[in-house]
Amino acid sequence: MIQTFNELGALRGQIAQWKREGLRVALVPTMGNLHGGHHSLVTLARQYADKVVASIFVNPTQFGPNEDFSRYPRTPEDDVAGLEQVGCDAVWLPSVEAMYPLGVDRTTRMHAPGVSEVLEGASRPGHFDGVCTVVARLFLQVQPDVAVFGRKDYQQLAVIKQMVAELSFPIQIVGADIVRDEDGLAKSSRNQYLSAEQRPVATTIHRTLLGMREGYVAGQARDRIEAEATAALQAAGFQVDYAVLRTPELAEPTFDGGGRVALIAARLGTTRLIDNLEF
């Protein structure tokens, strides 16, 4: 049976017992409202560890002033039931007060310069500071041997890898492949905000990413690829934040050849969607 923890001392006691037994522990951080994509992270984590802990915490420090923290769906009972079905061993459910004992406005914050300041960081200033702040605390609370994050949030994964390397966290960071619906739409908690009419339109994002890859393979100039991608999304009714090609490190390419990642962030109505494709 899955264990749930609301108190840090009890969680640490259980993890200490596992480690005394020589067991490896994996952490899967989430904000709840879980779907198949999240469940795949737990399944992957089981390949790297003997015990899997998922955290559910809607983190106020990563929401911007125009982003409704209170609107984020909270479904803890369903989340725990789903985690149990995929073999999660424990769920950590901290309160805001436990995570930020001095209060959200007075808390010590983390910042990963460079990679956190472009793309999503430019569109959502301070977002990755909040991500780093909460992830660092989760690492200190759970002390996992490995942590699993989805590649759908490609930039978030890059930011966390930078923070872990710079601060020498003794934690292996694993990126999990994007889970998609049959029509290509990446699974996301935000998909539930799409209307019945918007849902098929949202698949334009994945088709556009595939087109960006085709353009790159065909030798098209990056500026042309990005311009055509933006135009395709706008024609479908999206408000585009960015549609870009970057190196795996998220730098602007300075030469042809080498790996690339295409990244898109766009708003359909009031719903902001992100996706990417590595090639």
Kindly label every feature range from the protein language model.
Residues 246-252:
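Short, solvent-exposed loop/turn elements at beta->coil junctions and helix N-caps
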Residues 1-2, 261:
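A residue-level signal for beta-strand positions that form part of recognition/binding surfaces
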Residues 243:
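Substrate/ligand-engaging "lid" and interaction regions
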Residues 2-238, 246, 270, 277:
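Nucleotidyltransferase catalytic core that binds NTPs
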Residues 23, 258-259:
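A structure-centric signal for secondary-structure junctions around beta-strands
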Residues 252-255, 261-279:
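Short, basic/aromatic-enriched C-terminal tail that caps enzymatic domains
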